A protein has these predicted regions:
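Short, amphipathic, aromatic/basic-enriched membrane-interface segments that mark the entry/exit
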Residues: 1-7, 115-125
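Hydrophobic, membrane-inserted alpha-helices
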Residues: 10-19, 111, 129-137
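Membrane-interface helix-loop-helix junctions at boundaries between adjacent transmembrane segments
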Residues: 17-67, 71
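Alpha-helical transmembrane segments and their membrane-interface exit regions
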Residues: 34-46, 154-163, 220-223
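Long hydrophobic alpha-helical segments that form multi-pass transmembrane helix bundles
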Residues: 51-116
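Membrane-water interface signatures at transmembrane helix termini and the short loops
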Residues: 123-160
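Extracellular/periplasmic helix-loop-helix junctions in multi-pass membrane proteins
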Residues: 199-214
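Conserved small/polar residues in nucleotide/adenosyl-binding loops
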Residues: 226-231
Length: 231
């Protein structure tokens, strides 16, 4: 119990430092958040496939970066006004739709060509193409929070839990998943407690909630790899 409390306080401390960095240096923090997130989401996606064990580190970086970059470009393009509103709240630069659109076409084309060109990647082509097609239509017809939440829950968090279970217990059998969820339950309940409190005691309609959520995600993502030190 003592080690869990120590780890929890350590993690909260890192998140708090992330908040301070984000508000002290918003432009640098935003860029760092996007770069870290591109790698994080791309790595998480490809870690769910067994392909990475057959590649040396220098080669497997390409699908990771291309997947993560394409993901964020799709999110930003289909929510450009909301994203720029968030950026405006931090007094930083705006994103240009035409530039993002051109960049998306180029990177997505390179990504698809890479998957088709290498035999090891070829079997992932259809899955990746359909994934981004669905993501595009999802984010085009929904709000930024809703679209990102659907992706985060079904395409990121579940895979992340599986990877963490495998890392901690060196296996992802149901008994270890159950053990992991039991150990994580106090943190889940604490998060729900603060979420309910925030909902009932904060006038959401009177404040711009997106910058707060964005900053929180940035702080969490910036220290996301610390979960690998969980005993």
């Amino acid at each position: 119990l003592k080690s869990q409390i120590t780890y929890f306080l350590y993690y909260l401390g890192l998140v708090f430092l992330g908040f301070l960095f984000f508000y002290a240096f918003p432009s640098i923090a935003l860029l760092s958040f996007v770069l870290v997130s591109i790698y994080h989401f791309g790595e998480q996606h490809w870690e769910s496939n067994s392909f990475n064990t057959n590649l040396y580190k220098g080669k497997k970086i390409f699908p990771i970066i291309l997947h993560g970059s394409t993901f964020f470009l799709v999110i930003f393009i289909n929510n450009i006004d909301v994203v720029n509103d968030v950026l405006a709240s931090f007094n930083t630069i705006f994103l240009d739709y035409s530039v993002l659109e051109t960049l998306l076409i180029i990177l997505f084309s390179i990504y698809m060509l890479m998957l088709l060109s290498f035999k090891l990647f070829r079997r992932y082509f259809i899955g990746e193409f359909l994934f981004f097609l669905l993501l595009y239509f999802l984010t085009m017809n929904s709000t930024l929070i809703y679209g990102f939440s659907v992706y985060f829950i079904f395409f990121h968090s579940i895979l992340s839990i599986k990877d963490q279970v495998s890392y901690i217990y060196e296996d992802d059998k149901s008994q270890y998943i159950k053990k992991y969820l039991i150990n994580a339950l106090p943190y889940l309940l604490l998060a729900l407690f603060f979420l309910v409190g925030f909902y009932f005691f904060v006038d959401i309609e009177s404040i711009n909630i997106l910058p707060i959520i964005f900053t929180f995600l940035a702080a969490i993502t910036s220290v996301s790899y610390t979960h690998l030190t969980l005993p």
